[in-house]
């Protein structure tokens, strides 16, 4: 994925992990020895898929609901505009990842409250089947399809 991230942006890059990084530009940053880091322009250009893809779509923004943004064979990503309490009943077939992209929320499970703020990410094991989300936040919910 080619990306440039500026101040104030939140990017959720949901993908399979990879040990490969190609740098197209690195703002002349230096490594620990004071050398500029290696660029990989030719390799990066060879790896880019240049086909135009029209994937823009509007999605629902129902309060306290899991609104599907991406649903593909590998994973599902939902947007939750949380404004109070949302009870969650997990199928137990996949872990769930929550990313707080705005505001703050609490996750209540088995009488224990865990608190999360903007920028926090939490991995919920598949065995945690019933819990509550409370607060005022914008949350991404990701799980394996």
Locate predicted features.
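Hydrophobic, well-ordered secondary-structure elements that form the walls
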Residues: 80, 103, 119, 139
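Conserved hydrophobic/aromatic beta-strand scaffold that supports enzyme active sites
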Residues: 2, 11-13, 77-79, 97, ...
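A generic structural signal for well-ordered coil/turn residues at beta-strand boundaries
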Residues: 8, 71-76, 94, 118, ...
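C-terminal amphipathic alpha-helical segment
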Residues: 22-95
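Glycine- and acidic-residue-biased ligand/ion/polar-headgroup-sensing regions
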Residues: 8, 82-110
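Short acidic-glycine-tyrosine-enriched beta hairpin
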Residues: 1, 109-128
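Ligand-binding loop in jelly-roll beta-barrel domains
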Residues: 2-20, 126-145
